[in-house]
Amino acid sequence: LGAISVSSLPAREGESDWGPLYSAHYDNAGKLKKRGAGPFYSAHEADGEQFWGIHPFYSRSFTESNDRDLQNLLWPLGSIKEQFQQRSWWFATALGWNFDVNDPESRHRLWLLPLWFSGKDAQGENYAALFPLGGHLHEFLGRDKIEWWLFPLYFETDINDVHSETWMWPIYSNTKGKNVERFRVFPFYGRSSLREDWRKWFVMWPFYSAGEYTYKGSQGGGWMLFPIAGHMKLSDQETWYVIPPLFRYMKNGEQTKQYLPWPIIQKSDGPTKKFYIWPLYGWKKTEDISTEFALYPIFIRQDIERPTERIERRVVAPIWHWEKRSGKDEAGKVVKTNSTYQKLWPFYSFSEKVGPGGTTSHFRCLELSPLRNVGGLERNWTRLWTLAEHHKEPGFTETEVLWGMYRRVLRGTEYRNTSIFPLVEWGKDVDRQRDGWQIGKGLLGYGKDEGKKRLKLLWFLDIPVGK
């Protein structure tokens, strides 16, 4: 550590430890990790990502493998992302896209929700709209073009060759296109059709609706008299409703489904088996997934069987989360544990992963987020409430408490360093023949450098004391 001028402690070039004020240490990959100002500053390079942040105000990360440059400003309030010569950003309700930052005439968008929309579409056509007064908006909500004037008085949309006109939304609408037709005077009457696949209509919605279906392998029709009853019969299935949606019976081949009433009692038999007394208790089984709950959504169990993996999850929301992933052999038998994860919210989280080189584990306290590994939180917020952290991987261990008031770093059996800032620190570097200790960041210190003993007094006095 570069706290005293002589090499009485096993510092390497660029390393320093001033507790929560500033620290710099090499990780197992030989990359320098910097932290400072308590929880407010951090910078590191890991897994191909270069990162630095002033938490929670600003952070920036660059990943060379996928050419991604990501900036967060008071996340989730604002963000800027550049990738493959494209830029997207948001700040509050303002959003923007530039699809080629190297071309000033490229496709772009600017939205100031919910009032202003402008840009240039993929065909090079400019557009602008002010809601609700009027204008043209392209490439929005799955539509190629949208035009409105004094919404909801009038608007029209285009998607491929399908054109829709609407007056006094949602009352009058008329849609026409290749193999598509829709018309409504809501709620009095409406009809729609798609190719030769189906035809639907309603009268005095939602009280009466009906449809005819001519899908290949599934033909028939049905009706709904809401809220009294309904019936649908196709060539491969049949469904009855009584007081919809409360009571329902459906049969589709070997599969049956019953609501008695929905959502409280739900029962299914066949390839998918299910029984719910919601929200008190329930279970569901498919070929590869089994779930169970009690007092939903508090107690949840989920098991997933895949050809090469088993995933087990247990939740006592929002307090306890546990997950285990196990590997299988060619016969489908579980033979090893690949990873585990547990969280006792808001106190701690612990994860462990087994890789080709050994086991990597990570412990963090506190853990205020009820969600797991949310990128924006990890980049901008979690360091603020991380009072203690322990990371271990093959050949490397790092422990930090109170943002560096206590820190311990181990690299194999050759290097170790422990600091209780600003009281005492000690360490050893076998490769460089260094070891030593110091009190008060140099008030008193003793160490060896390549076998030569040295004494440190009053921060400035450097006294050789023999070999």
Functional labels for PLM-detected ranges:
Residues 11-467:
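Outer-membrane beta-barrel proteins and related beta-barrel translocases across Gram-negative bacteria
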Residues 1-5:
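Bacterial N-terminal signal peptides
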